[in-house]
């Protein structure tokens, strides 16, 4: 009887672990009511004012800004600060924790870059760090220091630190 109970317990734990690990890829929120065929083979990219919708969170990049710094916070010679303002909405029934260091990974012209404290002080309307109550939003900046002649900034965003699913936001330098 003990072996049967132990076997059932192990099976239940295995199914629970598999169920927790299943996560869906983000979907692009449609701007219009017409829906075309979606091709899930190619990875989706998102841009300004496009929403990546995961099962529990919705990420929308709402603004891109470039700065040469202010006060004591200036980039190295030949660099600029770039900030992307995001609105993150909690779609779940549970509180969600956001960390700009753990959920975001940046690349400038295919070279890894990291979140910059100095850049974030320039874009001082808040960071993308904190807890979001169910149905509420978090608005803040993800900021990096990049070469002044940058062409493409790519941000890969995870919906949780336990997930492998990500959305890729791509921004072009129009200056």
What are these regions (language model features)?
Residues 1-4, 8:
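Positively charged n-region of N-terminal signal peptides that target proteins for export
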Residues 11-12:
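Repetitive helical segments and hydrophobic/amphipathic motifs
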Residues 15-19:
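C-terminal motif of bacterial Sec signal peptides marking the signal peptidase cleavage site
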Residues 20-175:
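Conserved functional micro-motifs across diverse proteins
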């Amino acid at each position: 009887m003990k072996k049967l109970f132990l076997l059932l317990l192990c099976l239940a734990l295995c199914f629970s672990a598999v169920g927790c690990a299943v996560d869906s890829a983000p979907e692009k929120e449609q701007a219009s009511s017409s829906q075309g065929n979606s091709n899930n083979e190619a990875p989706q990219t998102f841009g300004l004012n496009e929403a990546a919708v995961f099962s529990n969170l919705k990420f929308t990049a709402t603004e891109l800004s470039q700065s040469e710094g202010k006060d004591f916070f200036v980039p190295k010679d030949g660099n600029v600060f770039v900030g992307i303002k995001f609105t993150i909405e909690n779609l779940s029934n549970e509180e969600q924790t956001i960390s700009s260091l753990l959920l975001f990974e940046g690349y400038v012209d295919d070279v890894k870059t990291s979140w910059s404290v100095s850049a974030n002080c320039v874009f001082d309307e808040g960071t993308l760090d904190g807890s979001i109550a169910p149905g509420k939003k978090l608005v803040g900046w993800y900021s990096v220091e990049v070469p002044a002649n940058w062409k493409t900034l790519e941000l890969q965003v995870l919906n949780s630190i336990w997930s492998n699913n990500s959305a890729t936001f791509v921004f072009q330098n129009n200056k």
